[in-house]
Amino acid sequence: MCSLFALVAVAALAQSRAERIIAEIRNPKSKYVVVIAHRSDWRHYPENSLAAMEGAIKMGVDMVEIDVQRTKDGVLVCCHDKTVDRTTTGTGKVSELTADYISTLKLKTKEGVTEYGMPTLAQALDLCRDRVLINIDKGMNYYNQIQKMLAERNMVEQVVIKSSKKPTTVAKYLDKHSQNMLYMPIINYTARKWEVHSPLFESYLASDIPSIAYEICWDGTLKGERKIFNRVIKSGAKLWVNTLWDSLCGGKEHSFADNHALNGNEDKIYGKLLKYGVTMIQSDRPQLLLDYLESKGRHTLP
């Protein structure tokens, strides 16, 4: 019996941290709550920088969210905006600049110019591989290029990609590959978008698309989000919520945004989300969320 336990322990050690997180995401019964750092550790380093990613990894998050744009010469770089104006010492649209030029720029924060440069997606993948999962935002239009980069690094399932595209459109991307990134539909439960997203939601639930999770955004203009949550959970997928700002998670009157969890209010915000069955949370205050989850025994990998 002891030798059996020893073998199990050795097997667990042989798995990378990323693989262990993936196993929890794939397990519908797991109560482990996956913490996603929005634009990585941007409170201490420039957003989407390698330093911010490293900071988030050391913090203990499960996934870093990064945004990608493609340069004039076809290189994917980690940048949220279509231009480099806000985040770097340069100017211009990413699509009209070369990767070499962008590599000469320095990233900026509200405090000023930093020592850090804008990384390529390749550099980000090499840093994160096996250590933390990645959520690539704004990436569906570059799906095949990203897939190739991941396959070369043997880390295809270490990336979550998402969109509000129709299942039939997504299927065209997935069908080209024998192994795909983890896919997540974005569903907006709002008065402004629900007319379109209601049939989108139904079509995903009825489709063969292997949706690992559903990102549900709601602003309080419609009632009944709990029914949407429950249907996601019943499907066997994970329920992903963004606690970044009010309009993504309940609206001003019933917001679950991170700032409302400050000053000892974690139970009222994060605790309620856990009761709703949320098991993936993208946060702008990942350390606050991690501390809370660990205090509740909801962030311990087997």
Label each PLM-derived region with a short phrase.
Residues 1-18:
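Bacterial Sec-dependent N-terminal signal peptides
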Residues 14-302:
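Phosphate-group recognition and catalysis centered on beta-loop-alpha active-site segments
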